[in-house]
UniProtKB/Swiss-Prot annotation:
Membrane topology recorded in Swiss-Prot or TrEMBL: Peripheral membrane protein
Residues modified as Phosphothreonine: 399
Function, in words: Multifunctional adapter protein that binds to various membrane receptors, nuclear factors and signaling proteins to regulate many processes, such as cell proliferation, immune response, endosomal trafficking and cell metabolism. Regulates signaling pathway leading to cell proliferation through interaction with RAB5A and subunits of the NuRD/MeCP1 complex. Functions as a positive regulator of innate immune response via activation of AKT1 signaling pathway by forming a complex with APPL1 and PIK3R1. Inhibits Fc-gamma receptor-mediated phagocytosis through PI3K/Akt signaling in macrophages.
The gene coding this protein: Appl1
Disulfide bond entries: none
Subcellular localization(s) per the UniProt record: Early endosome membrane; Nucleus; Cytoplasm; Endosome
Name this polypeptide is given: DCC-interacting protein 13-alpha
Expression sites (tissue/organ): Expressed in insulin-target tissues including skeletal muscle, liver, fat, and brain.
């Protein structure tokens, strides 16, 4: 006969929703078998009880056998073979129904006993195991719930031991009960065939014995058919016995192997933490807020599917989307005095979930898995190898290198295969300066023991006025474009360039140099290494607004400006050469009251887009600002030239007016002189007028030369 559908006993300890769904199918099949066998039992019982109704009962039996093919068994894998067999039985029984007599003893032994035994023993055993399993499952859920509520701050060894022992006992009981329940359901598939065929075989044998003299109704073909059925029943029984023995052995092996797993927090030395996972599944407690200060915790089955975190409640056929974890952030948190809690925040910061793992191993594996998925490692050809390589790079970044060259070759693609002098050829416009920079020590770039700031200072902090002063006045004093003081707000609003990017702040630290991109690379390495050492996963998300005047970090929820970086103070910016989502820039500000005391701070960010786009946007803003400044200078120069020309024009007009007045005065003097005056008087008047005219002419020439 075809293969028998079986429940996987090996998956009973995991107790996943898929296993529970498959169990529901088997339970539905057992219910269908029970209903059908009850009808068949009633039909055969009528044969046994009532001699007078034997014919009618036989006819009903034949009818039920014919209707077997119309039954819908969820696990009816061999319906065609069984239907054809029962159809043939139905025909024979229908032919013999008119001449059957009551043979109560033979029918009781050969027909009623097997089906009664199946009904009273096997089916009741299934019902009993189902009830026991349900009780064990409820006890296990209650024990897990009590264990999850253990206080981390007020830890009591006695209470913890009792709760842990309770979890161990309930989990062991549930596992053992579930394995035996699965075994009984698997065995039921064999017993179903036996319970169907063996009573029929006994019934026919009783009829053969009764009608031994009626050989005309019992030909050789029928005997051959019955013999084949008997052989099939024996084969099914032997197969069942072998399978039962195998399942019992599997149960024993699993009980021994699964004993350490009954503990909710297994020994980490025996079960090491795998940090290279890109897929994970298991039960987690999810925190759901029910009010302003109240919340509930629901235990659900969570699993990752690509870049999505899925959840599935017990009894559901399939899981549903819980959160998109691409580009998300995950970190361990303390929540309601519960252990092993972690928080997942979506890439846009609008959705977050707090989950609780069952053990420390699950807690760290979930955080590492979600962190790997957030980096989209699962999209590569070999996700686990890529995750292992990334984690190994993080560990190497934490380990100090003996030289500056070795520290930065790990950050450059193909850096290990190039000779040490290859860096000087890729320096671009820096020329020979990169050769000198390669020989510098680490202290020449970043001061030793420099503190790292992992969070953004709020605008309402006490340091903000001084910081604004450093960014504002200090930036204008060192402005390379020569901008004059003015309203920053109006300049930002009138800016030609407005580009907005979503970034997450990784950290900032003071640097000692700001003339080479290696400063940014080294700062990235130290900040990432510090985050890895201290297990800092939280990042502050902001909107980075790039304009022609400044860079602004804006709170995405309140739209409040967190920090403002004047564009002239941004003297250097670069992108990580391997992880293009990482970028940073160096800000040169006034470090104190003295304008000559300047300090440089390097800020590192992670973006959803490529960091090169943000750096290109900053470069474009600087170019636009430079051209705007050049245009402003040219405009001011042109205005100055026009003012000089206008002044000269006014002087010339004034000179012409003076000359015109002199000429008019001369005409008046000439007209007023009399021709009959004495020569001396005429000479005196003429000499006086000439002297006055000459004085005025000299004065006009002097003014003209001055103009």
């Amino acid at each position: 006969m075809p293969g028998i559908d079986k429940l996987p006993i090996e998956e009973t300890l995991e107790d996943s929703p898929q296993t529970r769904s498959l169990l529901g199918v088997f339970e539905e099949d057992a219910t269908a078998i029970s209903n059908y066998m009850n009808q068949l039992y009633q039909a055969m019982h009528r044969i046994y009880d009532a001699q007078n109704e034997l014919s009618a009962a036989t006819h009903l039996t034949s009818k039920l056998l014919k209707e077997y093919e119309k039954q819908r068994f969820p696990l009816g894998g061999d319906d065609e073979v069984m239907s054809s067999t029962l159809q043939q039985f139905s025909k024979v029984i229908d032919e013999l129904s008119s001449c059957h007599a009551v043979l109560s003893t033979q029918l009781a032994d050969a027909m009623m006993f097997p089906i009664s035994q199946f009904k009273e023993r096997d089916l009741k055993e299934i019902l009993t195991l189902k009830e026991v399993f349900q009780i064990a499952s409820n006890d296990h859920d209650a024990a897990i719930n009590r264990y999850s509520r253990l206080s981390k701050k007020r830890e009591n060894d006695k209470v913890k031991y009792e709760v842990t022992e309770d979890v161990y006992t309930s989990r062991k009981k549930q596992h053992q009960t579930m394995m035996h329940y699965f075994c009984a359901l698997n065995t039921l598939q064999y017993k179903k065939k036996i319970a169907l065929l063996e009573p029929l075989l006994g019934y026919m044998q009783a009829q053969i014995s009764f009608f031994k003299m009626g050989s005309e109704n019992l030909n050789g073909q029928l005997e051959e058919f019955l013999a084949n059925i008997g052989t099939s029943v024996q084969n099914v029984r032997r197969e069942m016995d072998g399978d039962v023995e195998t399942m019992q052995q599997t149960i024993e092996d699993l009980e021994v192997a699964s004993d350490p797993l009954y503990l909710p927090d297994p020994d980490p030395t025996k079960f090491p933490i795998n940090r290279n996972l890109t897929r994970k599944a298991g039960y987690l407690n999810a925190r759901n807020k029910t009010g302003l200060v109240s919340s509930t915790w629901d235990r659900q089955f969570y699993f990752t599917q690509g870049g999505n975190l899925m959840s599935q409640a017990r009894g559901d056929v399939a899981g549903g989307l819980a959160m998109d974890i691409d580009n998300c952030s995950v970190m361990a948190v303390d929540c309601e005095d519960r252990r092993y809690c972690f928080q997942i925040t979506s890439f846009d910061g609008k959705k977050s979930s707090i989950l609780q793992a069952e053990s420390k191993k699950d807690h760290e594996e979930w955080i590492c898995t979600i962190n790997n998925i957030s980096k989209q490692i699962y999209l590569s050809e070999n996700p686990e190898e890529t995750a292992a390589r990334v984690n190994q790079s993080a560990l190497e970044a934490v380990t100090p290198s003996p030289s500056f060259q070795q520290r930065h070759e790990s950050l450059r693609p193909g850096g290990q295969s190039r000779p040490p002098t290859a860096r000087t050829s890729s320096s671009g416009s820096l020329g020979s300066e990169s050769t000198n920079l390669a020989a510098l020590s680490l202290d020449s770039l970043v001061a030793p023991d420099t503190p790292i700031q992992f969070d953004i200072i709020s605008p309402v902090c006490e340091d903000q006025p001084g910081q604004a002063k450093a960014f504002g006045q200090g930036g204008r004093r060192t402005n390379p474009f020569g901008e004059s003081g003015g309203s920053t707000k109006s300049e930002t609003e009138d800016s030609i360039l407005h580009q907005l990017f979503i970034v997450r702040f990784l950290g900032s630290m003071e640097v000692k140099s700001d003339d080479h991109p290696d400063v940014v690379y080294e700062t990235m390495r130290q900040i990432l290494a510090a985050r890895a050492i201290h297990n800092i996963f939280r990042m502050t998300e902001s909107h980075l607004l790039v304009t022609c005047d400044c860079l602004k970090l804006i709170d995405p929820q309140t739209q409040v400006t967190r920090l403002t970086f004047p564009l002239p103070c941004v003297v250097l910016y670069a992108t990580h050469q391997e992880n293009k989502r990482l970028f940073g820039f160096v800000l040169r500000t006034s470090g104190g009251r003295s304008e000559s005391n300047l300090s440089s701070v390097c800020y590192i960010f992670e973006s959803n887009n490529e960091g090169e786009k943000i750096c290109d946007s900053v470069g474009l803003a600087k170019q636009i600002a430079l051209h705007a400044e050049l245009d402003r200078r040219a405009s001011e120069k042109q205005k100055e030239i026009e003012r000089v020309k206008e002044k000269q024009q006014k002087e010339l007009s004034k000179q012409k007016q003076i000359e015109k007045d002199l000429e008019e005065q001369s005409r008046l003097i000439a007209a007023s002189s009399r021709p009959n005056q004495a020569g001396s008087e005429g000479q005196l008047v003429l000499s006086s007028s000439q002297s006055e005219e000459s004085d005025l002419g000299e004065e006009g020439k002097k003014r003209e030369s001055e103009a």
